[in-house]
Amino acid sequence: MGATLLFCMALLAGCAPSSPGPSKAGEAFKKEVLAVRDSLAPALMDAVAKREPRSTKKILEQSCALAGEGGNPFACGITILDSHGITLASATPGEPIKRLDYSRYEVVMTALKERKVVKTRLFLQDGTRLYVVAIPLVSKGESIGLLGLAFDASDLRNRFGLTEDEFMRVDLNG
């Protein structure tokens, strides 16, 4: 009797639904995030490690221009932070650099301390919903800065059909 009960419980556990796998929209979003990261991070590492705003801004502007010329402009806002959460550069064209302090933002400090990609959603004052991805820039096991990507949620829904739930389920650390 005990063996039969144990067998039935094992069978039921094996039949339990598994957590949903990544959706096509989630996979498309992940591919875009990784492409932006792979395009920007290697070029930025030295300037970010030295906390050089001018060099960081120049590299970011050149990378954005190259992506646009190649027919694949970055479809997100980009902010580069130093290891203390202070802005080194931003991809907003024509805007003067503002050394904003993001060190009080949990998403920023978590990504820097744990050296892993962290996602969150933010709401602007006008109601615009943003999906933010904080990617630590790591050199020799130490966080030297952060690559912050901000995507307009409605743009991602239009391009990929990505929902908020799918965004939150995307694993960018694997």
What are these regions (language model features)?
Residues 128-164:
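Conserved beta-strands of PAS-like sensory domains
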Residues 68-73, 112-113, 124-129:
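Short loop/turn motifs at secondary-structure junctions and domain boundaries
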Residues 2-13:
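Bacterial N-terminal signal peptides
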Residues 15-54, 161-174:
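Juxtamembrane extracytoplasmic/periplasmic/luminal helical "stalk" adjacent to the first N-terminal
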Residues 29-95:
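Extracytoplasmic/periplasmic sensory segments of membrane signal-transduction proteins
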Residues 53-57, 93-123, 162-166:
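Extracytoplasmic/periplasmic sensor domains and loops in membrane signaling proteins
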